[in-house]
Amino acid sequence: KVIACVLVVLGHFFQSMVKSTIIPDNDLYSWFNKTIYYFHVPLFFICSGYLYQKYSRIKNILDWKNNIIKKLIALGIPYFVFSIVTWILKTMFAGSVNDEMSGLAETLFKNPTAPYWYLYSLFFIFLITITYKNKTNKMLLIAFAIVLKAIALLTGGVGIYAISTVMANEIWFVIGMCLTDIDMDKMNNRFVGMLLEIIFIVLSVVAYKQNITNGLVTFILGLLACVSVLWIMISCRRYNNRFMDYVAKYTMPIFLMHTLFAAPVRIVLMKMGLTNSIIQIVIGLAISFIGPICTAIVLEKTKYLEFVIYPNKVIKLLKRR
């Protein structure tokens, strides 16, 4: 989860740097940007699927309904709050931002903006996916996800964003669910993960140089990258890493707020004439992580304002009173 979050921040940050012409759009940037998009969002879906299967049990229609209500609140509140804030800021400062926004209703319901489209997509995946109870259910779920992915690859998706994003990403979510059945003690050799990572990097360079954009190749590369990252992280889980543990507590705030901090700081620095790429990168990346973490800490102290990030946590707190 931390790796995926860091890569999302890096992807959005360097895209903004290139669009602002602070750093050049060269081969190194283009390769890096293309490569992380093979797998950083799939990693998020895999993590979500794993947690869903591990901690949820959907046995009947009542369980499904209660879970959907819970997910609607948990995903919907931060989705709407931060999408609206982003829309307002980009509309007010249209001349200073890199991307133009469509109408508010279209942004919220038809074409969600980055990075919040992930929450939008995840809700619809929860809507159609139930936890499996046995091997038969598991195989049916895998077959369902494969069929959706195959249709997405063959057709390029449909005109409705919610359907297209579910077709493309259901497979990653189901892979995460299936990870709950894997004996992770057998994945204790981190060198296997490192070897897979090296193979992925080499293949990603080849794909970039040959300009390969085939959907199936992209999926295979993404799968290889996800397996390598997961293998490395699982094999290293016995080692205490305070930094990773600390950042893991704030992945949601970082995901939600990194662009809201990075973009204004970039604009202010440019207004001050500080266009040096090193200064922009150091300060921009620092605020992308420090800003959301500090905000989350402040919101946690106030308890109830934390509702915009963790609504179900605050609701539970209110019910105890």
Where are these regions (language model features)?
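Alpha-helical transmembrane segments and their immediate juxtamembrane cytosolic regions
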Residues: 1-321
